[in-house]
């Protein structure tokens, strides 16, 4: 039996930290479904279709990856993908508090739902999409923070 997991997020934009978690999840699971959340409440920098396209570009060299947009409850999305496993990255203690609450909430909706927390490799532990956006919006170099495949998407945003 092949085991799938979901790695959900807004990926606005996808970072090297996200990519690190995806690669490490592939060492545990046969397939990783990268679930790009609509997240209108976050007022995304990129539209949903662009974020999906960026994730596909950033992961095109990896096998056993599927990129799918979703806008419903994560547990419902997981059921539709026939998996009960979700991967979440933890950078700091502050992430843990929030993720623990989400994990409990999801588990209350579906008792088979399992959240697996992965710490990023230390060199990526400070990277977040919001930090990348802030540096980018102030003209800083983000080339070491994001996959090279998405730099053209960011350059297009400058225009």
Swiss-Prot record:
Its cofactor is Mg(2+). One of its GO terms (biological process) is coenzyme A biosynthetic process. It catalyses: (R)-4'-phosphopantetheine + ATP + H(+) = 3'-dephospho-CoA + diphosphate. Pathway: Cofactor biosynthesis; coenzyme A biosynthesis; CoA from (R)-pantothenate: step 4/5. Substrate binds at residues 10, 42, 74, 88. The keyword Glycosyltransferase does not apply. It comes from the Bacteria. Pfam families: CTP_transf_like. GO terms for molecular function: ATP binding; pantetheine-phosphate adenylyltransferase activity. Gene3D superfamilies: HUPs (3.40.50.620). GO terms for cellular component: cytoplasm. ATP binds at residues 10-11, 18, 89-91, 99, 124-130. The record marks 18 as: Transition state stabilizer. NCBIfam families: coaD_prev_kdtB, cyt_tran_rel. Reversibly transfers an adenylyl group from ATP to 4'-phosphopantetheine, yielding dephospho-CoA (dPCoA) and pyrophosphate. Belongs to the bacterial CoaD family. Homohexamer. This is Phosphopantetheine adenylyltransferase. It comes from Campylobacter hominis (strain ATCC BAA-381 / DSM 21671 / CCUG 45161 / LMG 19568 / NCTC 13146 / CH001A).
